[in-house]
Structures are given as structure tokens and as C-alpha cells.
Amino acid sequence: MRALGHLKHKAFRDLLCRRLFAEHEVERQSNLYIYRNPELPLRVRLEAKKRIEALPTNAHPTKIKNRCIETGRGRGVFRAFGLARFPFRLKALANKLPGVRKASW
């Protein structure tokens, strides 16, 4: 975590949420499948629901936000590159993004 010292607080929190989600994703998906399966007994389904509720709050997929990996900005982020508008423009003009060229017609 020491190498991530340049990140702003919200970007750092988002990174932690992404890691937590990755750790608990399989467990969450399997318990959701059990909980949503109407053919299983009600007791088994309710136990699966309790296991889902016992997972950390930050491990939920809705906690993951689309933030710039350089600046931590939450708006104007290109999903394919994970960069906000201005860092994207700077890297594109410096030819540091593969496959991106300035348009000319």
C-alpha cells in the first residue's frame, strides 16, 4: 500500500473496494444463486441470505465507482483507459496510449 501514496482519498477507497469485491465475488455469486433458487428449501435460502449480509459492505459491486487512476477524478472518465479527460488528452498527445491518434480530416 505504500506505493499507492500518490492516490487521493476517494481513489484509494475505490481501490480498496475493488480489492474487497474481487476477494468476495465468488462467495457472493454462489450465495446469490442459492438465495434466488426457488427449488431449494426456504431455510437453506435464508442461510445464504444471512451469509450475503455478513459480507463487508465495501465488497458490494455498487460501491465500485469509475475513477481516474491518475487524479482520482470521478467525472469525465473514459472507461476503456481509466483516465479522466485531461490526463487522457495529455497521454494521447504524448503518444503514450496505444491505438489513440489525434483526429484529422
UniProtKB/Swiss-Prot annotation:
Location(s) in or outside the cell: Mitochondrion
Assembly and interaction partners: Component of the mitochondrial small ribosomal subunit (mt-SSU). Mature yeast 74S mitochondrial ribosomes consist of a small (37S) and a large (54S) subunit. The 37S small subunit contains a 15S ribosomal RNA (15S mt-rRNA) and at least 32 different proteins. The 54S large subunit contains a 21S rRNA (21S mt-rRNA) and at least 45 different proteins.
Name listed for the protein in its UniProt record: Small ribosomal subunit protein uS14m
Keywords, alphabetical: Mitochondrion, Ribonucleoprotein, Ribosomal protein
Species, as recorded: Schizosaccharomyces pombe (strain 972 / ATCC 24843) (Fission yeast)
Major location (coarse): mitochondrion
Role noted for this protein: Component of the mitochondrial ribosome (mitoribosome), a dedicated translation machinery responsible for the synthesis of mitochondrial genome-encoded proteins, including at least some of the essential transmembrane subunits of the mitochondrial respiratory chain. The mitoribosomes are attached to the mitochondrial inner membrane and translation products are cotranslationally integrated into the membrane.
UniProt family annotation: Belongs to the universal ribosomal protein uS14 family.
InterPro entries, per the entry: Ribosomal_uS14
SUPFAM superfamilies: Glucocorticoid receptor-like (DNA-binding domain) (SSF57716)
UniProt keyword Mitochondrion present: yes
GO BP, sorted A to Z: mitochondrial translation; translation
A Pfam match: Ribosomal_S14
GO molecular function, one term: structural constituent of ribosome
CC terms in the record's Gene Ontology section: mitochondrial small ribosomal subunit; mitochondrion
Signal peptide start-end: none
